[in-house]
Curated annotation (Swiss-Prot):
Protein name (Swiss-Prot/TrEMBL): Thioredoxin reductase-like selenoprotein T1b
Family: Belongs to the SelWTH family. Selenoprotein T subfamily.
Task performed by this protein: Selenoprotein with thioredoxin reductase-like oxidoreductase activity.
Superkingdom: Eukaryota
Keywords: Endoplasmic reticulum, Membrane, NADP, Oxidoreductase, Redox-active center, Selenocysteine, Signal
Native source organism of the sequence: Danio rerio
GO biological process terms, semicolon-separated: cell redox homeostasis
Subcellular location: Endoplasmic reticulum membrane
Amino acid sequence: METRCLYLLLVCVLSVNHATADNGSIKKMKMQYTGFPLLKFQICVSUGYRRVFEEYTRVLTQRYPDIRIEGENFLPQPLYRHIASFLSVFKLVVIGLIILGKNPFTYLHIETPGIWLWAQENKIYACTMVFFLSNMIENQCMSTGAFEVTLNDVPVWSKLQSGHLPSMQQLVQILENEMKLSVHMDSLPHRRA
């Protein structure tokens, strides 16, 4: 009975996974053939660039109604993501051990450090300190400072390379130049080889 339930669960998971994979490829195909330019922003959400992206999107949508605009979080390198994930779990374990009054050093046959004894005597301060210190390190690991802009998968602006955000005028000028260039390239006669 148990194996039948596991088999049924496995079949359900695989069918849902297959259905979502097909749906994603159909959506991607539909978006490929819309013909409208795609302006894509990759931003550091933890750096506070979401508002800048929303403001730019609002202005650019009014000025260029035919442009599709997408935004996504620019992820840090995998090493930093793994460090941040580890810290988020590790801090909860440490806070749990402090609250429960458990001493993990006795299991490791290590002498208990003085800071652990202090944490056991001052649980609220210790838990608060562990929480905020860990969050600070996690945020530092996840912050990329990125504000990358591509038009039809061609990079048009990179804060990581330039060191600053584009102004609205700069972004509009770049878009107009790229649009003129693409219209000019489309109007050239095609040569046959």
